[in-house]
């Protein structure tokens, strides 16, 4: 007499879903993500198809062709794009939970900051287009409040605050690519404030009374690693010629970081065949920030804490930006671009979560890369392989 036994198929998709927020299906129902679906109305299959699109660098057409042949998900690429838009608020919701659980939040209690950034997206193939994707995320709640798509090359497409709408009281943080007088002046005229890494060749500094600001002589007064100082300064609005008050905040790097900075200068000298000046070597011994944030609310220590926090956030975004550079934009419409961005960020955080807890291994029975290095690229390969393997096991028998 044969005893009854259960027989189940545990796919790598089950492994991946185990790292989703616990109540993600209930959240999906609350967001009504399947509203209007006409063909495949399975939540898991739709999510699986979207994850393949977001993580594997496929176009919507390639994704739906692959999922249709495997029997996983039967729908058109147009319908999948509409599902992506519907899933956008769900990805946003889950991003907030994952991000808050993995990262230290704002250094100022109750303070919201806008992180401004851009990245180039090269669509695959010999005729693939290259775009520059400008986006703004509010932190710590991880809400995308603006996106803009431009050509990667041409006039007016570089990193600039002028690509973004600014509201009175906005506090923006950005890297040195945004350290330009016209962009900072634009934010100031709109009633906003900036905190940017100084690009000393792109921004002319003045004293509050309009004289030349002697940055080098100021920096020479900081002699100890970890020592920080600030000075009042101003920049000039290129349009009105009016002075915009601000501060220079500088902290001297550790001796190890200074050695690395000098080494980088030497590499630039070899690569570009020019000799950096002594002033360039000195400036690279410091982290230098220009800010228009209010001094009373944002003293020197707080400005440095904000920059340190922004640097930590940038590390968290590193994988996210590498995923943004991989794949096809769904459309050039902001609604679908935002959903695409939220989905990419969710994939990045999911991989980060797997790496953090399991060092990239999904399960004891599905660890096919033990002999490889544990680098970021291999983490992504594991994730991609798990998604594709999960598609393979759904292929119907003939």
Residue spans of the language-model regions?
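Short Lys/Arg-enriched helix C-cap and helix-to-coil transition segments
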Residues: 89-103
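Short edge-strand/loop segments of extracellular domains
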Residues: 71
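Helix-turn-helix DNA-binding elements, focusing on the entry/boundary residues of the two helices
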Residues: 60
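Long, charge-dense accessory insertions within large macromolecular proteins
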Residues: 113-118
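Single, function-defining residue in the core of a domain
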Residues: 1-57, 65-66, 75, 79, ...
């Amino acid at each position: 007499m044969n005893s009854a036994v259960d027989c189940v198929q545990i796919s790598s998709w089950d492994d991946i879903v185990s790292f989703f927020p616990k109540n993600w299906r209930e959240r999906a129902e609350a967001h009504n993500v399947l509203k209007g679906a006409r063909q495949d109305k399975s939540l898991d299959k739709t999510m699986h198809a979207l994850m393949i699109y977001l993580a594997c660098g496929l176009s919507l057409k390639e994704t739906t062709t692959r999922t249709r042949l495997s029997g996983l998900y039967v729908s058109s690429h147009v319908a999948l794009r509409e599902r992506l838009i519907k899933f956008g608020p769900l990805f946003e919701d889950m991003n907030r939970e994952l991000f808050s659980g993995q990262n230290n939040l704002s250094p100022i209690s109750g303070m919201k900051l806008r992180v401004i950034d851009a990245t180039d997206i090269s669509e695959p193939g010999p005729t693939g287009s290259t775009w520059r994707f400008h986006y703004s995320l509010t932190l710590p709640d991880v809400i995308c409040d603006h996106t803009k798509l431009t050509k990667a090359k041409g006039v007016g497409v570089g990193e600039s605050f002028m690509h973004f709408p600014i509201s009175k009281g906005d506090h923006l943080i950005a890297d040195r690519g945004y350290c330009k007088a016209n962009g900072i002046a634009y934010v100031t005229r709109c009633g906003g404030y900036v905190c940017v890494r100084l690009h000393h060749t792109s921004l002319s500094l003045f004293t509050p009374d309009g004289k030349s600001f002697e940055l080098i002589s100021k920096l020479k007064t900081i002699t100890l690693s970890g020592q920080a100082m600030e000075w009042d300064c101003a920049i000039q609005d290129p349009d009105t010629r009016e002075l915009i008050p601000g501060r220079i905040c500088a902290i001297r790097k550790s001796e190890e970081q200074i050695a690395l900075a000098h080494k980088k200068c030497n590499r630039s000298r070899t690569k570009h065949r020019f000799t950096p000046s002594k002033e360039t070597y000195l400036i690279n011994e410091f982290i230098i920030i220009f800010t228009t944030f209010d001094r009373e609310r944002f003293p020197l220590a707080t400005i440095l804490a904000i920059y340190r926090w922004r640097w930590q956030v940038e590390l968290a975004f590193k994988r996210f930006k590498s995923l943004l550079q991989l794949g096809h934009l769904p459309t050039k419409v902001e609604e679908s671009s935002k959903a695409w961005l939220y989905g990419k960020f969710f994939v990045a955080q999911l991989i980060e979560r797997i790496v953090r807890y399991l060092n990239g291994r999904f399960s004891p029975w599905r660890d096919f890369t033990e002999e490889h290095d544990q680098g970021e690229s291999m983490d992504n390969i594991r994730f991609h392989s798990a998604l594709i393997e999960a598609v393979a096991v759904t292929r119907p028998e003939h």
